């Protein structure tokens, strides 16, 4: 891959990761701050590029995780093993407790956001569009091979991004200190 394609991949990995951390996690899920329309759109595009479900679903699972951490209601319960917490939870049906407790979480704040309503409605279309964008930029601007642009700019970037995110679910809960309070969402 052209060095610019590698730089592009790193920048887009950082962008998607920041959108998950500062957007989906801090702003939307935990309501740590408010943002104007255009910053919300910017984060919505980045979270779509991260391919970790739409923000409403991501936030519901995360709120459930915080409320019932390391229990059967936790979507990525570390007590079910390191692999399960890392990525295995995505390969099996959700534990009945996850579904039961997920229904108890109030998501009306996020469901009222028109940016998130748009993302949820068109998510299945928006994800491939982000992959086209990630491939198009290297091909158009520095004449990268289409296959290389796709595999480095879209696929490798996604694999790195997902494993960085999943490491929080697995490594942080397996080896980290557990100061969380289940009364806080």
Protein language model annotation of sequence segments:
Residues 1-166:
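Non-catalytic, topology-defining segments of multipass membrane proteins
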Residues 107-114, 175-185:
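Active-site-proximal inter-transmembrane loops
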Residues 161-179:
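C-terminal accessory segments of proteins
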């Amino acid at each position: 891959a052209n060095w610019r394609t590698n730089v592009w991949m790193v920048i887009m990995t950082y962008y998607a990761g920041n959108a998950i951390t500062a957007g989906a996690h801090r702003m939307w899920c935990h309501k740590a701050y408010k943002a104007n329309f255009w910053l919300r759109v910017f984060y919505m595009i980045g979270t779509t590029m991260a391919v970790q479900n739409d923000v409403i679903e991501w936030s519901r699972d995360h709120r459930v995780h915080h409320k019932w951490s390391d229990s059967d209601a936790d979507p990525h319960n570390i007590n079910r093993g390191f692999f399960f917490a890392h990525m295995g939870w995505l390969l099996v049906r959700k534990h009945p407790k996850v579904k039961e407790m997920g229904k108890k979480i109030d998501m009306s704040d996020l469901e009222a956001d028109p940016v998130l309503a748009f993302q949820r409605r068109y998510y299945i279309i928006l994800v491939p569009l982000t992959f086209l964008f990630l491939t198009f930029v290297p091909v158009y601007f520095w004449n990268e091979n289409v296959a290389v642009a796709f595999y480095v700019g879209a696929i490798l970037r996604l694999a790195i991004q997902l494993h960085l995110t999943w490491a929080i679910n697995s490594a942080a809960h397996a080896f980290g200190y557990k100061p969380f309070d289940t009364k806080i969402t």
